[in-house]
Structures are given as structure tokens and as C-alpha cells.
């Protein structure tokens, strides 16, 4: 097996150490461990999109109607701050990701426990402008997949209403989100990436 092929295999043995340390339910810990010695790298709070909105050129008639402070827009951070990004350092393709932790309606709780809106805030990722930017910057142009991955955590992952809601939103793009349920292993998270998403980075 060649060096390049080896670098494309995830370090599954690293998960054993995480189980022992109790760090297995932290996405950053999990992927930093399994990516060690591979061609994949995890960025925490990546900066690739930090100035995205400042680059928008507005029409003159709009400029005349809004406040225009005397600042250098190139120094601003008017953009998007994903929670993580995964890059294949050979192809330079990038998958941007969000972590949405939210309460939910489960055994012993009232239905009102599912009233949070973290999951709704993730809907901005479906907007035409961000889809285009994520594809351009990340290099994932295959239309059978979206250029982002959302990992849901907490009791929302077992809420009968919210799970149906999210399933409906993603329609035939079910691979673009993962319900990381409480006490579920990091192995399941990595398995989803490995089987459903990694091929779009290769």
C-alpha cells in the first residue's frame, strides 16, 4: 500500500484513547485524533469566510441610502464563522461544518423543552449566496451533496418534532447532517464522515 493511500486512511485506533480519557463526545477531540498522520486536517473556528460580506459590492443607489462609516472593509470580519472545517491537504477541498447543541422534548420533559432555535439558525446555510461561496471556497461542486455538514447534539437529536423537522428540511440531502445522540460514541460520528462525506474531499 502506497504512502498516499495510507494517508487517506483514518486513524481509528486513536478513538480507543479518547474513550479512556472521557473525551470521546467532543467533535474536535475525535477528529483531531483520527486525522493524526493522515492527509486530513480539522480547523477549529476556520477563518476562510471571515470577510465574506465585506466583499459585497452594493449598487450606488443603495450606498446612498445606508450608513457608510469611514472604515477599511478589508479589516472587518463581516462574514461567516463555521464551527469547524475539514480539509484534504492533497486536493485542498474543504467541508465546512456547524455544531448545533440544543435541548429537546424527551422522556421526563415538557414539549416546551424543544423551543430553542439553534437548529433554525443553521438554515442560513441553505441560502443561495452561502451555498455558492461554500462551493467556491471549499471546492465541493458535486450537486448530489451540499458543501456543508451540520452536527446536531443534545436532546434535540431525540425530540420527535425536531427530528422530523430537520429530516424534512434536508430532503434528499440526508448525508449533510448527523444526529450525534447523547452517550453515542465518537466512532459513529467518524463513520458517518468516512462513509458519507469523505469521498467528496478526495
From Swiss-Prot:
Keywords of the record: Endonuclease, Hydrolase, Nuclease, Restriction system
UniProt-listed InterPro entries: Restrct_endonuc-II-like, Restrct_endonuc_II_EcoRI/MunI, Restrct_endonuc_II_MunI
GO biological process: DNA restriction-modification system
Catalysed conversion reaction: Endonucleolytic cleavage of DNA to give specific double-stranded fragments with terminal 5'-phosphates
Single GO MF annotation: type II site-specific deoxyribonuclease activity
Top-level enzyme category: hydrolase
Gene that this sequence comes from: munIR
Protein name, per record: Type II restriction enzyme MunI
Top-level taxon in the UniProt lineage: Bacteria
Assigned EC number: 3.1.21.4
Pfam families: RestrictionMunI
The protein's assembly and partners: Homodimer.
Amino acid at each position: 500500500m502506497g504512502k498516499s493511500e495510507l494517508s487517506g486512511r483514518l486513524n481509528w485506533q486513536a478513538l480507543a484513547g479518547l474513550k479512556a480519557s472521557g473525551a470521546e463526545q467532543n467533535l474536535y477531540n475525535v477528529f483531531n485524533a483520527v486525522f493524526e498522520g493522515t492527509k486530513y486536517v480539522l480547523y477549529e473556528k476556520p477563518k476562510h469566510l471571515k470577510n465574506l460580506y465585506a466583499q459585497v459590492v452594493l449598487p450606488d443607489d443603495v450606498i446612498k441610502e445606508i450608513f457608510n462609516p469611514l472604515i477599511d472593509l478589508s479589516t472587518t470580519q463581516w462574514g461567516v464563522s463555521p464551527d469547524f472545517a475539514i480539509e484534504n491537504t492533497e486536493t485542498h477541498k474543504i467541508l465546512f461544518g456547524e455544531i448545533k447543541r440544543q435541548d429537546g422534548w424527551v422522556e421526563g420533559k415538557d414539549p416546551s423543552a424543544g423551543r430553542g432555535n439553534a437548529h433554525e439558525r443553521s438554515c442560513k446555510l441553505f441560502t443561495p449566496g452561502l451555498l455558492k461561496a461554500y462551493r467556491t471556497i471549499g471546492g465541493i461542486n458535486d450537486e448530489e451533496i451540499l458543501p456543508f455538514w451540520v452536527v446536531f447534539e443534545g436532546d434535540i437529536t431525540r425530540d420527535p418534532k425536531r427530528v422530523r423537522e430537520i429530516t424534512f428540511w434536508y430532503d434528499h440531502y440526508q448525508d449533510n447532517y448527523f444526529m450525534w445522540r447523547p452517550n453515542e460514541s465518537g466512532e459513529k460520528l467518524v463513520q458517518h464522515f468516512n462513509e458519507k462525506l469523505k469521498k467528496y474531499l478526495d
